[in-house]
Amino acid sequence: MPFTLHQKDSSTDARLGTLELPHGRVQTPIFMPVGTQGSVKTLHPQDLESLGAQIILGNTYHLSLRPGSGLIREMEGLHRFSSWNRPILTDSGGFQVWSLAKLRKITEEGVRFQNHLDGAYMMLSPERSMEIQADLGSDIAMLFDECPPYPCDRKYAESSLGYTLRWARRCKTWVQEHQPCSGEGRQHHFGIVQGSVYADLRKRCAEELAAMDFDGYAIGGVSVGEPEEEMLRAIDHSA
């Protein structure tokens, strides 16, 4: 994925750059409005453009329920469905599954849970998450991960990290088998660094994900109830 670094702050390592995505350029750092079900509530796509929004976020879990990823695929993707012609990032559904903690069961296969609409049981696996995001046709697809809660003891954090790394490999395999690895318009895939508040686990996760050679990397498992100082340390250990 083309990324041009324009400037880097010597004291903070903050970076100014440009991402080249299938539906346009994104100047970083950037605020990304959340369009859970394909659109940002109360705003028309033209309103977002006039406000300078360069990229929006869509939610894999919610879109898989309503209107369904199959219908969006038939509509030739989320961009056409939502009348948004600029870049879109879709999350993997992992964070929403985390929020349904009382209604879920995590196994090696994936996560079995009850959806919030009618209580029906669903299974979301790494492969299914990537398949849904491929149907949506987003510019950036996030890998399926396990977001540990806060507080979280080390034993749970280690087990959770194992899921995240093994699932990342399965996401990679699915992409290699079902999507082009190069070419104009291809979907880009981002790994998610987990490890709770444990510095060595976050370092391990970042290193192992980097070795898998994804297009980009995100910092996950923050802003889940931890104090601000813990959040800042977790970010520092992950970056």
Language-model-detected regions and their locations in the chain:
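Non-catalytic, usually N-terminal nucleic-acid engagement modules in DNA/RNA processing proteins
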Residues: M1-C181
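Extracellular/periplasmic catalytic domains that process cell-envelope and extracellular macromolecules
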Residues: S82, E184, G191
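Glycine-rich phosphate/ribose-binding loops and adjacent secondary-structure elements
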Residues: W174, H178, Q187-A239
